[in-house]
Curated annotation (Swiss-Prot):
Name assigned to this protein: 3-O-acetylpapaveroxine carboxylesterase CXE2
Residues the record marks as active site: 158, 262, 292
Pathway in which the depicted protein is active: Alkaloid biosynthesis
Gene: CXE2
Disulfide bridge positions per record: none
Source organism of the structure: Papaver somniferum
UniProt motif Involved in the stabilization of the negatively charged intermediate by the formation of the oxyanion hole: location: 72-74
Length: 313
């Protein structure tokens, strides 16, 4: 392809390391089943919380609901928690399971390169912990009254799957009690390396996620001067000081979702093997048909995916 920035409808200013985003991203306003909460004022991060629709919520409040801490996709550079594509997907999760979904509006690159998003993930985990401990003056009533802090899950899609993975590594070193992480859900997680895989080369000009666009996303997201063999991109590289070797101590179960039409599928299969070698019990749902992010666009596949997640939870 000619210009990956043209594909992304973005302009990068290398002097300021900022991105002008012209990509059309509609946002969805709040309704009675969603609310926005400030997470870190200094970092200008926030959370969008989803509950089941009112009529279903009234039925399910006789039992506590699982809490899903969710990280959206967008190559680390696009979208927010209120972006319609992410809002609708999280609302579907909250409705179908049912569950409380805490969607993290983390900082984007290149203005805030990795590990900024991982730091925001830690803030979100600590916020959920503080809710469980009742430490905050303005406790979030939905979590306080209806959330099951012993049944929490970390979930992410695409680059959000990468963030979810690294958040789980950091969680190993954290005292999260009373929060208990019951599992990790990685939906088409975004990883890479300098060495190309067969699926990388098979669909170089993939209509949804071309190779040149993936490379640019990593150039914008990774610390300056880093290659795609940085641990943030390539999980097979020696760990960055977090206890990835002890991952099974916290994350006993992991669901990896993928599609063979996704150019990232080889890396997702590699990730499954690595997690299994670390003692993590991994379940997979990998479909022959489908492309990167297809459940966000195809209602039928989304319904099937939600069924798999519900069974896992």
């Amino acid at each position: 392809m000619a210009d990956p920035y043209e594909f992304l409808m973005c302009i990068h200013d290398p002097e300021e390391d900022t991105l002008t985003r012209n990509f059309p991203i509609p946002a969805t306003p709040l309704d009675q089943n969603t609310k926005d909460i400030s997470l870190n004022l200094d970092r200008k991060t926030s959370l969008r919380i989803f509950r089941p629709p009112t009529e279903e919520f009234c039925v399910t409040t006789n039992k506590l609901l699982p809490i899903i801490i969710y990280f959206h996709g967008g190559g680390f550079v696009l979208f927010n928690a209120d972006s319609t594509i992410n809002h609708d997907f999280c609302q579907s999760i909250a409705t179908h399971l049912p569950a409380l979904v805490v969607s993290v509006d983390y900082r984007l690159a290149p203005e805030n390169r990795l590990p900024a998003a991982y730091d925001d993930a830690v803030d979100a985990l600590n916020w959920v912990k503080d809710q469980g401990l009742g430490k905050l003056n303005n406790s979030e009533v939905w979590l306080k009254e209806y959330g099951d802090f012993s049944k929490c899950f970390i979930m992410g899609c695409s680059s959000g799957g990468n963030i979810a993975y690294h958040a789980s590594l950091r969680a190993i070193e954290m005292d999260l009690e009373p929060v208990i992480i019951n599992g990790l859900i990685l939906h088409s997680p975004f990883f890479g390396s300098l060495q190309r895989t067969e699926s990388d080369l098979k669909v170089i000009n993939d209509q949804d996620l071309p190779l040149a666009v993936r490379d640019v996303m990593w150039e914008l997201a990774l610390p300056l001067g880093s290659s795609r063999d940085h641990v943030y991109c390539n999980p097979n590289i020696a760990n960055d000081g977090s206890s990835s070797g002890n991952m099974a101590g916290l994350i006993k179960r992991c669901l990896v979702i993928g599609f063979y039409g996704d150019p990232l599928i080889d890396r997702q299969i590699q990730l499954v093997k690595m997690l299994e070698e670390k003692g993590v019990k991994v379940e997979t749902w990998i479909e022959q048909e489908g492309y990167h992010g297809v459940p966000c666009f195809d209602p039928k596949i989304r319904e099937t995916l939600l069924g798999k997640i519900k069974y896992f939870i």
